[in-house]
Amino acid sequence: MELTPREKDKLLIFTAGLLAERRKARGLKLNYPEAVAFITCAILEGARDGRSVAELMSYGATLLSREDVMDGIAEMIPEIQVEATFPDGTKLVTVHNPIV
């Protein structure tokens, strides 16, 4: 199977997001890379589902709370930017204060 670097990046994000989802489901607090992957993966999937940029910006800020992440992680992530593919092209989705 031949994959472009972008496709490899998306698979890596998906794998990390899936791992974070499983750890969260088991009640574990997420660390920095897990929290970023969890939110990023959800945004990429939302774009694939046809949701708008505005919807995903709001949605991204509802996925995790401070109780879901290790101490200090929320302060380490003031925003997350994701380049997602929408039906009408690639767009940048910025989620401000993603962990409240």
Curated annotation (Swiss-Prot):
Subunit architecture: Heterotrimer of UreA (gamma), UreB (beta) and UreC (alpha) subunits. Three heterotrimers associate to form the active enzyme.
Keyword annotations: Cytoplasm, Hydrolase
Pathway(s) this gene product operates in, as recorded in its UniProt entry: Nitrogen metabolism; urea degradation; CO(2) and NH(3) from urea (urease route): step 1/1
Catalysis: reaction(s): urea + 2 H2O + H(+) = hydrogencarbonate + 2 NH4(+)
EC identifiers of the protein: 3.5.1.5
GO biological process, one term: urea catabolic process
A cellular component annotation (GO) from this entry: cytoplasm
Family, similarity comment: Belongs to the urease gamma subunit family.
Any GO MF annotation of the entry: nickel cation binding
Lineage: Bacteria, Pseudomonadati, Pseudomonadota, Betaproteobacteria, Rhodocyclales
Name of the protein in question: Urease subunit gamma
Location(s) in or outside the cell: Cytoplasm
Keyword Lipid biosynthesis: no
Principal cellular location given in the protein's record: cytoplasm
InterPro entries: Urease_gamma, Urease_gamma/gamma-beta_su, Urease_gamma_sf, Urease_subunit
